[in-house]
Amino acid sequence: MNAAIRQRLAEAAKDVQMREILTFLYRDHPQGAPFEGLKEMLFLHDNFEEARLQQLVEDKILIFDGTRYKIAVTARQVLDRDPVILMEEFLR
């Protein structure tokens, strides 16, 4: 399962804005943040849709508690062991 989560994290991180969201939630806001807050704090493009985050919830990368998105425990464990997944250099 961790291999699948690691692979999904790596796939999601290929998108610059998704990588910014994941890094922000992992490193800066482990308590989570609402979608509108993420859009405002990270200056996401207006056409960035919340459905993309919902897909990561379905993939068990994020948790949504009704108001805020957070990194899921299993995804956090993968990132704790291998944080380079979120580094741009790793993705090249």
Give the location of each predicted region.
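Short alpha-helical segments that sit at the start of domains
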Residues: 1-22
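Short helix-capping/hinge SLiMs at alpha-helix to coil transitions
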Residues: 12, 26-31
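Minor-groove-contacting beta-hairpin "wing" of winged helix-turn-helix DNA-binding domains
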Residues: 67-76
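Short, amphipathic alpha-helical interaction segments positioned at domain boundaries
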Residues: 75-92
